[in-house]
Amino acid sequence: SPAAPVNPNRVAAMPPDLGMPHYSVYPDPNRPFAKAEVISLDPRQFDLHLVAGTVEPRSTTGLVGTGMIPDDEATRRGLVAAFNGGWAAMHGHYGLMVDRQVFLPAKNGVATLAWYADGSLRLGVWGRDIQPSPDIVSFRQNCLPLIENGAISPELGKLSLWGLSISDEAVIYRSGLGQTRDGKLVYVAGNALSALTLARVLSEAGAYNAMLLDIDDFHVAFITYRQVAGKDGRVQVVGTKLRQDMRGFDGHFLQPFALDFFYVTRKL
């Protein structure tokens, strides 16, 4: 019989001084090699930012994203982490707006992370608990919700709704983002996860609403950054992958990148 999951197995993979609680879980007793990382972000300590890629999401409005973390002194000093966004436009044409610039319009019934003018964040479903509003300054949509108002989606058995690998595998590297009832964000990423297993990990981590982000090991990446003194006196940042089986490289998101992503800065 398969080994029972170790749940959770707390590890010190992330530098504790980053202030983002992190632990690992082995969530699938039938796949003891499946390991997921769970990272908590408190918006009282950190700001989350959205960047459109240089290629994706392929805009219907002619806009092209910068694809990189802004290279200014304040951002470099505050930069803590960055992680992957959602699917390419061809896989659903889910909405994306950055600083009131619409790359793809929002779709009803789709899981959405929205940024508001007062600085708050809300993760929910567009047209239900997130209504179109001039107060929304940015949003990223992706798929139907994994978790809505505390309930894991009953549709999660329909595998194709939440993505398959190129070889039609449903149990693959996946990532997702949740929001707890008190407003904290939870990022989860791991190998050999079904959409249902990902949703369960997010739920156990306290997510009241949650959405799928990108999938497969070519696209899932979480990078932490540390500040070092540059030769010219400017602050430089050095990236480190959270896991070596993530295909990204340590300098991910510091140079123009094709896909959308999120980055995290410490509130100054």
Q: Predicted segments — roles?
A:
Residues 1-104:
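Zymogen propeptides
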Residues 83-153, 157:
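Active-site-adjacent helix-turn-beta-strand microarchitecture at beta-sheet edges
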Residues 92-109, 162-163, 168-209, 220-268:
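Conserved, well-ordered active-site substructure
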Residues 39, 46-47, 112-115, 177:
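Broad, structure-driven detector of short, well-ordered beta-strand segments within folded domains
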Residues 33-36, 76-78, 108-110, 141, ...:
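Extracytoplasmic
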Residues 46, 119-122, 184-185:
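Hydrophobic residues embedded in beta-strands of well-ordered beta-sheets
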